[in-house]
Structures are given as structure tokens and as C-alpha cells.
Amino acid sequence: MIKILLFAGLAEQAGTQAIEIDMEQATTDEIKASLKEQYGLESIDTAMIAVNESYVKENTSVSSGDTVAIIPPVSGG
């Protein structure tokens, strides 16, 4: 299982802050594409990704037991 954590507007759009996917391996790009399709998360393309509390680059490999945080851009003043 790979645990996905969603924050801010992404969590609101998905209706949940945490999702578990039953995969042994995936890339961060595959996870984002899957969530975009399943939950209609259009703004996921601009989100930052962290795996096990460390920011990663696009298309990073993720394994079962990892936690992936998807953090949308924050704006405000």
C-alpha cells in the first residue's frame, strides 16, 4: 500500500485528506495522473510532491509502505 496525503484545496476537492492505493510500485507522475482522473483534481499538476517527508522531483519511484504528500501552491498575504 502507498499512502497519499492531500492538503488544502486538493483535499477539499477529493473529499478526503488521505487515500491508500494498493500498489507495490508507482511513480509520482502515475499517482498524480490516477488521482487527477479518479477525483477530478485539475490543480494537481502544479502541486509539490514529498515522499516520506522529503520533497522529490517529477517521476520519482515510490514503493509500498511509502507516504506521498501532495501539496498545492499556497497564496495569500
Curated annotation (Swiss-Prot):
What would be one Pfam family of this protein? ThiS
- Modified-residue entries (Glycyl adenylate), positions: G77
The molecular function terms in GO held by this entry are: nucleotide binding
Picking any one GO biological process from the record gives: Mo-molybdopterin cofactor biosynthetic process
| Residues with PTM 1-thioglycine | G77
Known post-translational modifications? C-terminal thiocarboxylation occurs in 2 steps, it is first acyl-adenylated (-COAMP) by MoeB, then thiocarboxylated (-COSH) by IscS.
The answer to whether keyword Ribosomal protein applies is no
**InterPro entries hit by this protein:** Beta-grasp_dom_sf, MOCS2A, Mopterin_synth/thiamin_S_b, ThiS/MoaD-like
Sorted keywords for this record are: Molybdenum cofactor biosynthesis, Nucleotide-binding, Phosphoprotein
Kindly state the subunit structure of this protein: Heterotetramer of 2 MoaD subunits and 2 MoaE subunits. Forms a stable heterotetrameric complex of 2 MoaD and 2 MoeB during adenylation of MoaD by MoeB. During catalysis MoaD shuttles between the two heterotetrameric complexes.
Summarizing the function annotation, the protein's role is: Involved in sulfur transfer in the conversion of molybdopterin precursor Z to molybdopterin.
What protein name is recorded for this chain? Molybdopterin synthase sulfur carrier subunit
Where does this protein come from, organism-wise? Bacillus subtilis (strain 168)
